[in-house]
Amino acid sequence: MTNLITMKNIGKEMANKLISVGIETKEKLIQIGSKEAFHKIKEAYPNACLVHLYTLEGAIQDIEFNQLSDNIKKELKAFNDSI
């Protein structure tokens, strides 16, 4: 099992938030996906914002969050707006 902090975009603070909501490994994050992970974080940390969702998706895709495609960003923004 791989430590979350080894993933792109995942620093100590984000790793701690993920662990606090039961997502303790890279494999678990990939398995549940960025949207479900963000939803869990948002419930525990209401001030979580769209950039947090972008960083999670970037981590899963193994790219910097600012390199996400416009289509993915639109999809993630729509999800964020719906919760």
Language model features with spans:
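Extended, structured, electrostatic nucleic-acid-contact surfaces
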Residues: 1-9, 15-16, 47-63
